[in-house]
Curated annotation (Swiss-Prot):
Gene Ontology biological process terms from the UniProt entry: diterpenoid biosynthetic process
Pfam families: Terpene_synth (PF01397), Terpene_synth_C (PF03936)
Name of this protein: (-)-drimenol synthase
CDD domains named among the record's database cross-references: Terpene_cyclase_plant_C1
Segments traversing the membrane: none
Cofactor field: Mg(2+)
Organism listed in the record: Persicaria hydropiper
Pathway assigned to this chain's UniProt record: Secondary metabolite biosynthesis; terpenoid biosynthesis
Biological role stated in the UniProt entry: Catalyzes the conversion of (2E,6E)-farnesyl diphosphate (FPP) into drimenol, a precursor of the sesquiterpenoid polygodial. Polygodial has been shown to be an antifeedant for a number of herbivorous insects.
Binding site for Mg(2+) 2: D311, D315
A GO molecular-function annotation: terpene synthase activity
Domain notes: The Asp-Asp-Xaa-Xaa-Asp/Glu (DDXXD/E) motif is important for the catalytic activity, presumably through binding to Mg(2+).
Length: 559
């Protein structure tokens, strides 16, 4: 697996450093100061949530048995999931959606636009390959969606949300996305007082299917509370659970902030690295916010942070000679290599080894220490790819866009490593076969990498090109095809959408791997869509990122 590392002929002076400037995190020690509630209060919160949960389960069972109430059942399932409490009723919901799919007499042919769209989206999101021909009844003789639908704002919004679960060949959904986007924008402009305008505005910015589940739940709770027909029990369930889980997240973030502060990595680096623990934890909540994934979050955040420093070393400080030594040391993965590294690199290298050894200790009680080797191999591969990009920058080499995506950039975004690390804390569902599959760079992992890499490059290329840096996908595309920046971004955006179709196909039955593992990959794509939509809100974390962290990690929701 190891590849030789050769020093390229110098083009840029070997000791010139491409130093970047990163602002400090706006959060400081905010989460370190968090004081968890006492055990009595915690137990009371848990008991209250369980009590309401039982009431919701009773209502769900009642709706499942009711004859002639398919719309109520669809709406109930959707609200439960959008409130963020679907994980508490996961098996009940799976069984009901299976029954809906199996029921030829469910009545979808008689549904209006909103409920047809809801039926379609729910089934697709639960893995059922239902045909988009079901929307044919809303088209005119010309084969296009009827303009008369424009007055049905709720229905248009539902169709818009459904269009984002499209796969390759779903031409009707491609048409639906264009049609609904046009009409929803008109609603915002021409009907600013329409009660659905806040929800429409949010959806146009962040489609539900591509949104970070935890953040989307926070927004939906606010929208649902203003719905005059909301179910009070469901709303209470969503709020109570949100606050309970938020308390857990804040306790975890406090502990992880202490871990990072004790490492003192930021102070030990001779350059301004991205000191982003709350931001990194926010990213971690993308793949898994549910309480049972605490170990997954610990692993992901710790790898995220130590890798972020390594990334900054390759990308924003190290000379080519230093990076050659670091890459060789990474390939050997041995503490004896410390003597061969500059002082500042010793700190980062030692933290890498320490972190992965800690993972082995954490997983030893489960008999799963063996799985850490897969993450370690991906970390080594990441260093090789970082080095490849550093050589390109050093040699002033501009790869074609295809070469850039194929040889380096997809891996350097971290999805291959991130996917394997996601699997580490998942328990027995993450078999050796699953790790081998993930390390084999399957189509879906490549698609996720393309989404991440291209969205990152589109959002950050102006900042990155303000210093010595490998060309982004935008620059590579411009040079390869002789187009302007706007055209390059539009064409790369099409590749992002095509990759999303690959992701959506992955989530349809029969699953290539257990669904819990595939969901982590889907959720990684979702968090990237949130963080890199139009900007790099991880690097520049004092605007959109700060607002999003505030939404889900600061104040509880008033009951």
């Amino acid at each position: 697996m190891s590849t030789a590392v050769n020093v390229p002929s110098a083009v840029r002076p070997a000791d010139k450093r491409p130093i970047a400037s990163f602002h400090p995190s706006p959060w400081g020690d905010y989460f370190l100061k968090y004081v968890p509630c006492d055990q009595v209060t915690q137990a009371k919160m848990e008991d209250e949530v369980k009590k309401v949960e039982e009431d919701v389960k009773k209502e769900l069972r009642k709706l499942a048995k009711a004859v002639g109430k398919p719309l109520e059942l669809l709406n109930f399932i959707d609200v439960v999931e959008r409130l963020g409490v679907g994980y508490r009723l996961e098996q009940e919901i799976e069984d009901l959606v299976q029954a809906i799919f199996d029921n030829d007499k469910f009545g979808v042919d008689e549904f209006d636009l909103y409920h047809t769209s809801l039926w379609f989206r729910l089934l697709r999101q639960h893995g059922f390959h239902v045909s988009c021909d079901v929307f044919g009844k809303f088209k005119g003789r010309n084969g296009r969606f009827k303009d008369s639908l424009a007055s049905d704002v709720k229905g248009i919004l539902g169709l818009y949300e459904a269009s984002h679960v499209r796969t390759h060949g779903d031409d009707t959904l491609d048409e639906a996305l264009v049609f609904t986007t046009t009409h929803l924008k008109a609603v915002v402009t021409n009907q600013p007082n329409h009660p659905l305008v806040p929800q429409v505005t949010h959806a146009l910015m962040q489609p539900y299917h591509k949104g970070m589940p935890r953040l989307e739940s926070r927004h939906f709770i606010a929208f649902y509370e203003k719905d005059p027909y909301h179910d009070k029990t469901l709303l209470k369930f969503g709020k109570l659970d949100f606050n309970l889980v938020q308390a857990l997240h804040k306790k975890e973030l406090k502990d992880l902030s202490r871990w990072w502060k004790d490492l003192d990595m930021h102070a030990k680096m001779p350059f301004p690295s991205r000191d982003r623990v709350p931001e990194g934890y926010f990213w971690t909540l993308g793949p898994f916010y549910e309480p049972q994934f605490a170990l997954c979050r610990k692993f992901f955040l710790q790898v995220f942070k130590v890798t972020s420093i390594v990334d900054d070393i390759y990308d924003a400080y190290g000379t080519i000679d230093e990076l050659t030594a670091f890459t060789k040391a990474a390939e050997r993965w041995d503490r004896s290599c410390l003597d061969e590294l500059p002082e500042y690199m010793k700190v980062s290298y030692a933290s890498l080894i320490d972190t992965f050894e800690e993972f082995e200790r954490d997983l030893a009680p489960q008999g799963r220490s063996w799985s850490v080797k897969y993450a370690r191999e991906e970390m080594i591969q990441m260093c090789r790819v970082y080095y490849q990009e550093a050589k390109w920058c050093h040699e002033k080499y501009s790869p074609t866009c295809d070469e850039y995506l194929e040889k380096a950039s997809i891996v350097s975004f971290g999805y291959n490593l991130g996917t394997v690390v996601c699997f580490l804390g998942m328990g027995d569902v993450a078999t050796k076969e699953a790790f081998e599959w993930a390390r084999g760079n399957p189509k879906v992992v490549r698609a996720a990498g393309i989404i991440g890499r291209l969205m990152d490059d589109i959002g950050s290329h102006h900042f990155e090109q303000g210093r010595d840096h490998v060309p982004s996908a935008v620059e590579c595309y411009i040079r390869q095809h002789g187009v302007d920046e706007v055209t390059a971004q539009r064409e790369l955006g099409k590749r992002v959408e095509s990759s999303w179709k690959d992701i959506n196909e992955m989530m349809l039955k029969p699953y290539m791997m257990p669904k819990p593992l595939l969901t982590r990959i889907l959720n990684e794509c979702r968090i990237v869509d949130v963080i890199y939509k139009g900007e790099d809100s991880y690097t520049f974390s004092n605007t959109t990122m700060k607002k999003n962290i505030s939404h889900i990690l600061t104040d509880p929701i008033p009951i």
